[in-house]
Amino acid sequence: MVFLRFASLGLLILSLSACGLLPEQEDETKDWSANQFYSRASAELADANYQQAIKYYEMLEARFPFGRYAMQAQLDVAYAYYKFDEPESAIAAADRFIKLNPTDPHVDYAYYLKGVVNFTRNIGFFDRFVPVDAAQRDPGAARQSFNDFAELVRRFPNSKYTPDAIQRMVFLRNNLAQSEVIAARYYMKRGALLAAANRAQYVVENYERTPAMKQALELLIEAYDGLGMEQLAQDTRRVLALNEEQGTFKDFETAKPRTLGRKVWDFIGLDRN
């Protein structure tokens, strides 16, 4: 028994000694320049190796916190996080870039990226294979995305990202309106007529000139009839008939406005000057 104990102790000592004899793994990046870090990170990003790209961008900023490479890495890592399906980290990185570089020529991209991240963040893994109507998803991220794009449009009306942001805002607004209609129908089926009327009224007041407007008015009429509010039901019927006569109920995308930009200015109430 004593022999076995000494033998075990000897083996332990030998193993520890062997560990000490093995050379430590050398850090290939120890002598890298900022340019080398950025080039490697960008190559990994281009090859869709997003986790590796994030690692090198963050190492670059840690070792070379000042200079143009570090500044660009702050922005690129936000995109890498977005592609790596880490929306919270992507938005945090974009916010950090905006805070540290408010006058940078590329800061408009940081605002745009925030909108894009929120635009897609509520599409989960399952939705990628079994698509779900966007209007049936939780509208929280859609509202935040709309606000992010609106901030971009307000601050940088001439940005190259603004036209795409405006198109996305139109899509988001239509789907936000439709989500309210879906909620109103849900309440209607459950017999909660007042709740249904409130949801439909919200669409009428906040989402004019969307495809959901006609449905909202029809739901309002049904709810008012059920509640015995005859005068309100009649008034809403007149509004519905008037809009149908004037051809108001056109899909926003197929209507012929003066300009797409002017449509969105009207919707979000921004300064048109």
Q: Which role fits each region the language model picked out?
A:
Residues 1-19:
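Sec-dependent bacterial lipoprotein signal peptides
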